[in-house]
Amino acid sequence: MEQQSSYNKEELLSCGRGELFGPGNAQLPLPPMLMFDRITHISEEGGAYGKGEIRAELDVKKDLWFFECHFNDDPVMPGCLGLDAMWQLIGFFLGWTGGPGRGRALGAGEVKFYGQVLPTAKKVEYVINMKRVIKRKLYMGIGDAHLYVDGREIYSADDLKVGLFTNTDNF
């Protein structure tokens, strides 16, 4: 499989159907839980630690599913969905680098929210800086992440961990 450096929505949906990395390997969730529309850049080099970087975007639209229910008359994207997108991207990175197994979020260090995504926003950008990729019995990625809305940073998460598992029976 040839590695691409960017992915469009249809390619991300293909990953969600298990077609991109093969059966039993890393998959993205399908909508509505897929929290980005495109990966604009992915590389095993670069980033703040020289271990890789992922950049992705979500187009904000007033009719996104969560605005209707979170909250009544006070629509805001749930912070946990932005955090989940960061884990989704690290899992994608692990599959993209050839890691076997299904992705599972394993934890986070410090998470900070200092802004919000409102229906009036235009674009969310996620930036993940990989700190470490372990390619042993457990295939695991650790990264620091930032979420920007219309160019302003509003979330950060340190030491996000995602593992790939070939068997999740005892997980």
Swiss-Prot record:
Catalytic reaction list: a (3R)-hydroxyacyl-[ACP] = a (2E)-enoyl-[ACP] + H2O; (3R)-hydroxydecanoyl-[ACP] = (2E)-decenoyl-[ACP] + H2O; (2E)-decenoyl-[ACP] = (3Z)-decenoyl-[ACP]
GO cellular component: cytoplasm
Entry annotated with the keyword Magnesium: no
Residues of the active site: H70
EC number assigned by the record: 4.2.1.59, 5.3.3.14
Cellular localisation: Cytoplasm
Pfam family, one: FabA
Domain of life of the native organism: Bacteria
InterPro entries per the UniProt record, alphabetical: FabA, FabA_FabZ, HotDog_dom_sf
Biochemical pathway: Lipid metabolism; fatty acid biosynthesis
PANTHER family: 3-HYDROXYACYL-[ACYL-CARRIER-PROTEIN] DEHYDRATASE, 3-HYDROXYDECANOYL-[ACYL-CARRIER-PROTEIN] DEHYDRATASE
Classification via HAMAP family: FabA
Name this polypeptide is given: 3-hydroxydecanoyl-[acyl-carrier-protein] dehydratase
Name of the encoding gene: fabA
